[in-house]
Amino acid sequence: MESSENGVLELTDRYLALWSETPGTPPGHLRRFSAAGKAEKEREVNLLLEKSLPEMDRFGEMEEGDRARYLGRAHTALGKLMTGEGDPAADRFFTECESAGKMFVRRAKKFDPSLSDDDIHQALRNQWVFNSIQSSLSHPVTLTPSSLGYSLMYPCTDNWIDGAGHTPAEKDRFNQSLKLWLEGEPVTGKESGDGGFRELLRMIESEYPREGYPAVYMSLLAIHRAQQRSLILHGPVEDHGEAFLQSLTIEKGGTSVAVDGYLVSGALGPEALQALFGYGVVLQFIDDLQDMREDTSAGHSTVFTRAGRTGPLDGVTARLINFTCDTIRLLNGLSPGGGISLSRLIEGSCIFLILEAVARYSHLYTGAYLRAVEEFSPLRLSYLGGLHDRVRTNLASREHLLFSA
């Protein structure tokens, strides 16, 4: 199966069917945490925050690159605390990710000094996904030219499209130019800048020449198509069925992480492509749950904003937890050399991000559901929701960066 339009359609339909068949009931197979276990984890988090206070206090005085590096370290430390549990393989992976992240921030700021903390962290999130795939496929965990190029590609182009001074016609021409550049075609006519896109694309081409790695560029075209189609979700959707709307989300999420897989190894077998596509779908659904407030304010349609109009989010969130577990397990056995599988670590990280969103949006859930799901949380939900507020107090408007997926 390839990242052709037909291949993407087949994968989208497969995961749409899996999502529809997944029960919206509390999971019965996740690890449960005792009250004593939660209390111990909370003590560890408190200690972590206390150690971070000196840097938090001078956060606003830091250069943007230093702030991004600090947030990366905080993300790593929290991830180790919540999911690593002293596993040497997990500890090594987090250490390697932190090293790659530091290098990423330096290279990103060198490429474009105007990139904001938000831009860098958005791009760094993809680098972490890329690193997790490297480890799952028994590749060294590191920054590569193509991972830097792809991770920065959409923050840079989004900034161009969202920036002032460009007419709708110019933005439409720019999107058409993006497609042609991805296809390797020359673009004629005057261009009022390209958002750095062509230079980033050249980073990918330096590692994966077009003539030798056509699947890499098919995957890049697939995510470009998916992003364009998903713009339907930014407007009125009443004329579209629920399955169609879900398919737009699934296609966008799946193709975005499939690109990472191709950039790790240059080619993917059908099993690896299916597993990584599913990984991307999970991350997209989690993003949508975490962004519930912002999407509602902006009028963007997601499975969660639509469900929230008719009642509590109990069922759709329970479905997401079950879907996450079923899908992430497909990452098992991807390593051709019998290397370490990170599926358990990835599953734990994803579940924690879902629970953090539940804690923040507790008013959107019934008391019965909150009590049921708290059994699977390493922290009390009341503590987890308050933790978000504590970080916000110290980092002001930057608080969401630490807890973003």
Where are these regions (language model features)?
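Alpha-helical membrane-embedding segments
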Residues: D287, T310-V316, L381-Y383
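Conserved N-terminal diphosphate/IPP-binding helix and adjacent helical/loop segment
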Residues: M1-S147, C156, A222, A226-E238, ...
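Nucleotide-sugar-dependent glycosyltransferase catalytic core
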Residues: G299-P312
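Hydrophobic core of alpha-helical transmembrane segments in multi-pass integral membrane proteins
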Residues: R73-L81, W181-L182, L200, I204, ...
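Primarily interfacial, aromatic-capped hydrophobic alpha-helices that serve as membrane anchors
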Residues: P186-A215, L313-V358
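Acidic, carboxylate-rich catalytic segments that either coordinate divalent cations
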Residues: F352-A405
